[in-house]
Amino acid sequence: RSLICSAEVNKAIHAGAQNKHIPSSKGYIEGRSYLFGDLEGAQALVERYAGTGTAVLTRKGDWANKEIILSDEVIGAAVDLETGKAEETKKFVIHYGKSGAHIVPAKEG
């Protein structure tokens, strides 16, 4: 958690990766889980929730550069890859990388 909150982890939104999950953007990929809002909204979610969720670990116990968050409000929709059905969700995963972070809405439960 302290690593996620530190300056070592890039928390700026990576526009290219995030736009794949914003339906109003040119980069949106049909069938992906999507975020309500825009890049600024995604950045606000990272700033608010970074370091507050559950870190995802590899089998070896190393941090997988991901964090699972359950927010107070609906942030987007998780799309079932098999059925294509979208369900509103408060759960999301922040993916952290050298080039920045992006958010992927996830199915609750």
Residue ranges and their predicted role:
Residues 1-109:
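Functional cores of ribonucleases/endoribonucleases
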